Amino acid sequence: MKCLCCGKDIDKNGENGWHKSCIKRFFGASKLPEIEIDDETLKKLADETVNNGLTVPGVQKKLSLHLISENKSPKLTIVNFPTGYILKPQVPQYETLPEAEHLVMSMADITGISTVPHALIGNNGNYAYITKRADRITNTDRTAMLAMEDFCQLDLRLTQDKY
């Protein structure tokens, strides 16, 4: 079995498909955070996010998540701002889309292209793609947005032509 974060072999001591060291590096926690988002909640929240102009509409729904630790049990929760992670769950139209995105990002890592930290995480019996937000700088009184490019932009395609 391979770690869902780094892709290296993992033994039976791995937690839900992750090395303990990968959990610490990615989440800053000693335990893999809990996450439970059903399809109905996902659709509702993703639609709200698009309608509020917080993300671009597309095939792959995106949710902003924040990591909280209550009673030493970390959880990824759905919040507006500040957010620390982006979750992209499975979509019915394209099987294994989160796995494909993680694969492409891992290939970029191997070839020396700088990427944001990324991994797969279990969600309702499927995998979801999760990435750390690197496009925001948050301090005590405000959040600044940084310009970022994706592979669509690097190919000089417009966002509406992405899918």
Task: Give short role names for the model-derived ranges.
Residues 32-33, 161-163:
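Short secondary-structure transition/capping segments
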Residues 42-162:
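Conserved ATP-binding subdomain of kinase catalytic cores across diverse folds
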Residues 1-41:
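Regulatory N- and C-terminal appendages and interdomain linkers associated
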